[in-house]
Amino acid sequence: MIKFIQCVRRKSGLSVAEFRQHWDAYREKVQILAEVSQAVRFAMSTTLRVEENIRIMMSRGTDEPYDGLVEIWWKKGPDALEILSRPEARAQLEAIRHLQEEFMDLGKSSFFFGAEEVVLDRT
């Protein structure tokens, strides 16, 4: 299984509430792309604003957590890349890029493909 992962930081000056409004609109666009590209799974996460996250960050000296995380899974990488190169997917990717520029700090975010190895799944 291959997946595309986005670790997203909000733009400076954008409140968490404002980020979440953009995030909801972003979900709709990415969901269309996931469907067009025949993804088998699509998930989005937002960081919980809890004290434990601050303790973890302070004890390990890490940066602040990302504001959001997107994960899209496909069965086969080459098939996903071929589908994503099609005109309908390219058009959706362009619309997504414009939306990203509105609310994401792209220089502090990270986007990458990875191979998933499920070690434990009790769902």
Located regions from the model:
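Macromolecular interaction modules
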Residues: 1-123
